[in-house]
Amino acid sequence: SQLVFAADAKHGGIELPDGNVGFQPGSTFKAIVLAEWLKTGHSAGYTVNASAPKNYAPHTFTVSCDPKRAAGPWPVHNVAGTNAGVMTVREATKQSINAGFTEMLKDLDVCEVTKLAASIGITKADGSPLDPDPSIALGGTLVPPLSMANAYATFASGGKYCKPIAIDRILDASGTSMAAPSADCTQAMDQGTADETARTLRATSEPGGTAKDAVFGRPIAGKTGTTDEAENTWFVGFTPQLSTAVWIGDATESGRSLVGRTIGGVTYDKIYGSDLAVPMWRDYMSQALANDPALPIPSHG
């Protein structure tokens, strides 16, 4: 199964709604950790020790809103074959290095990460707030694809979050236009944080990045995601005009891996967000933006 959601980066309009179910977002949630990292005065040029495996003891992470939450021991691994050591946050983002982001989380408050997520529309599938568990850094919760598309639209729009609306226009019986509901927009994060988040997420589309195959003749930014055993694969990406989330997984059988499945005539012995979600995103976006100009990212400075 696959779901594709697109959100107008300026107005919050939904381009292609297909339901509002929840799936683990995997590494696409790293963009939220990155935004909180930058919001708190850190830089994408700072270095972290991204080597793995790591095993975090209870109470390693700050959870100010729930101090009794032990959250450990928690083993963290990088993708097999990844050669990661001390690297910049930008490089950890480009390569989607798990241990790099858990090390970043040690310098943050998990509750502030969930608060930031809520401010840009990321909640559980039932609308309730995310649990302040450190595992959210690697996407250990259930969220709707629409929420992820709209959150990334906030990065594209200089920090402005607009609640998604499905109605583009209203016509009466005579064909006369009537006032359509407008998106409820707020400045969820300062423009500098949003722009630097967008700028850092551009790294994934560069050679050696997990989303290098998403490029279609214009600047793009985004983040791939793959959950344990490849039960969910994602790409959430944006241009200044449009943010789109692509999820591929098995919506009918919870917990069923995509490994060993035949998709489009190809049987995958391993599969990541870069394999199917990225090219699907690219093909959709290239058509959706065929008549729109190529703009820089960020487009606000």
Regions found by a protein language model. Name each.
Residues V89, F101, S135, P145-M148:
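Short runs of predominantly hydrophobic/aromatic residues within well-ordered alpha helices
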Residues Q2-F29, T47, E91, L142-G301:
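A penicillin-recognizing enzyme superfamily signal
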Residues S1-M87, Q95-S96, K115-A137, T141, ...:
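Short pre-catalytic segments that frame enzyme active sites
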Residues E36-T40, D107, S119, T154-G158, ...:
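Active-site catalytic microenvironments for nucleophilic, acid-base chemistry
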Residues M87, E91, L108, E112-K115, ...:
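Generic alpha-helical secondary structure signal
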Residues N98-S119:
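A small/polar active-site loop signature that marks catalytic segments
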Residues H77-V79, E103-M104, L138, G222-T224:
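Thr-Gly-centered strand-to-loop micro-motif
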